[in-house]
Amino acid sequence: MYDDALAWAGSVLGSRVVSADPLDGGMTSTMLALRDEAGTVSVLRLMTNEPWRSHGAELSTREREAQLVLVNTPVPAPVSLGLDAEGAATGVAAHLMSRLPGSPLVEVTDAHLDAMADLLATIHAVRPAEPFRTFQSWAWEAKWVVPARSRHPDSWRRAFEVLASPAPAYEPTFLHRDFGHRNLLWADGAITGVVDWVETSTGPAWLDAAHAASNLAVMFDAEPARAFVEKWAATSGTAPVRHWLVMDAVGYLPPPGRPPMFGDPAQQQRLDEWLGLVVDGLS
């Protein structure tokens, strides 16, 4: 099915690809774990899923550029090996990168949250020679519709009012922009990799922290999310900024006419609960 893409990857690697196994995740893309005849393992991203496929050249190029910036930093990011941004050889935008050891979390502990906060500070300390694009909000106004089965409709309305107000000033910071436990690899309790750099941006540090917290709230519950916010406040030496926490939570609402991002009603309920907390300032 991916013969052209695998042939291209083999030409980049200098060794024929002998196996290609799907990796979990990959909302935007098909992610394949490759092994070539020389025994080298790598990962191939193919931008197959809409609407990201239509922006595949931009997204895959940004990921490669971010990984190049990170080569000589303490951030454990994959190494970019090859890019076919226009899909000339592969049919869709393709990015070949090294494969990092480790696996995603299935449960989260206080020690994991500490490690996440420390890594986020390490990411934010990176100073690219040229800044990446200014962040894009995923909470655009067309999404500002109270979820049908919300237990906190007034909280959503207040959230929309927060976003309608001017955003607070911030110090431009290098952002992963999709930072969270889903994009981290772990081994023996330590982070061995941070992946998925297609959304790398410049923006407020609290937006990265907010996204990590929202993910924790939706996938687990509010307690690890609240704990991560507290840990990031301590690590960064800054107070939580409600605007960015609200922006990230609202960003999980679907565009008009689309189903909820999370098909699991329990996840939808946890998002609803988290939004209520962040609107009230996590008091």
Regions found by a protein language model. Name each.
Residues M1-S19:
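Juxta-kinase regulatory segment immediately upstream of eukaryotic protein kinase catalytic domains
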Residues D24-G25, S29-R35, S42-L44, S80, ...:
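Active-site acidic catalytic loop and adjacent metal/ATP-binding pocket
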Residues A33-L59:
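ATP-binding glycine-rich loop module of kinase domains
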Residues T48-E50, E86, A94-E107, V145, ...:
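A glycine-centered beta->alpha junction motif in the catalytic cores
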Residues P51, V69, P104, L184, ...:
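Conserved protein kinase catalytic core
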Residues E65-V75:
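Structural motif at the C-terminus of the N-lobe alphaC helix and the adjacent alphaC-beta4 loop
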Residues P78-P172, E199-P204:
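A cross-family kinase active-site recognition segment
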Residues T202-P204, H211-S283:
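Helix-rich C-terminal or lid/interface subdomains of diverse kinases
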